[in-house]
Structure formats: structure tokens, C-alpha cells
Amino acid sequence: MTPVHFSFTSAFILGLMGLAFHRTHLLSALLCLEGMMLSLFIALSLWALQMEATGYSVAPMLLLAFSACEASAGLALLVATARTHGTDRLQSLNLLQC
């Protein structure tokens, strides 16, 4: 495994571990998701450059577009829950009460 592959794999795993273990605030969960998406975007971009395949160069742009949509939906949910519940703590959110 090259150092580049190791760094992007470790960045993805760190984002996944942060999402799994630091589940106190919604904003920290969204930041971990964004870190995972960023590492996937860079890894896909480098993979398309290494393979010199122009057909696969669309995939990183699609991933980036979906990542932006995910971030905007997450921030909208963050604002909505902060207005209704007064906090962004994930323990105060319950799907049965919302």
C-alpha cells in the first residue's frame, strides 16, 4: 500500500470512527460525514488520473454534487432541530417525538 493510499484510507476510517464514537452533537456527525466524503472524492479523483480513463472522471464530480446536497440537507436539519429543540445534541432527538 502506497503512502497516498494509506493516507486516504486512514482519513476515511478516522471519519467513520468519529461518526461512530462521537455522537453527541449533530454538527460533529455532519463534519465526520463531510470528512469521509472528501477522502472518497480525492481517492476517486486520483484513481481516475492514475488509470488515465476519461470515462471515470465524471464519478468524482457526481460524488461532489451529492456531497453538497447531503451537506445542505444536514445543515437544514440542524437549523430546524436547533429552533424546535433549542439544542443540537443527538440524545435529545427522538423520532417518535418529532
Swiss-Prot record:
Core subunit of the mitochondrial membrane respiratory chain NADH dehydrogenase (Complex I) which catalyzes electron transfer from NADH through the respiratory chain, using ubiquinone as an electron acceptor. Part of the enzyme membrane arm which is embedded in the lipid bilayer and involved in proton translocation. The lineage of its organism: Eukaryota, Metazoa, Chordata, Craniata, Vertebrata. It comes from Oncorhynchus kisutch (Coho salmon). It catalyses: a ubiquinone + NADH + 5 H(+)(in) = a ubiquinol + NAD(+) + 4 H(+)(out). Belongs to the complex I subunit 4L family. The gene is MT-ND4L. Gene3D superfamilies: 1.10.287.3510. Its EC number is 7.1.1.2. InterPro entries: NADH_UbQ_OxRdtase_chain4L/K, NUOK/Mnh_C1-like. Keywords: Electron transport, Membrane, Mitochondrion, NAD, Respiratory chain, Translocase, Transmembrane, Transmembrane helix, Transport, Ubiquinone. PANTHER family: NADH-UBIQUINONE OXIDOREDUCTASE CHAIN 4L, NADH-UBIQUINONE OXIDOREDUCTASE SUBUNIT ND4L. GO terms for molecular function: NADH dehydrogenase (ubiquinone) activity. The keyword Acetylation does not apply. It is a multi-pass membrane protein. One of its GO terms (biological process) is ATP synthesis coupled electron transport. It comes from the Eukaryota. The chain crosses the membrane at residues 1-21, 29-49, 58-78. GO terms for cellular component: mitochondrial membrane; respiratory chain complex I. This is NADH-ubiquinone oxidoreductase chain 4L. It is found in: Mitochondrion membrane.
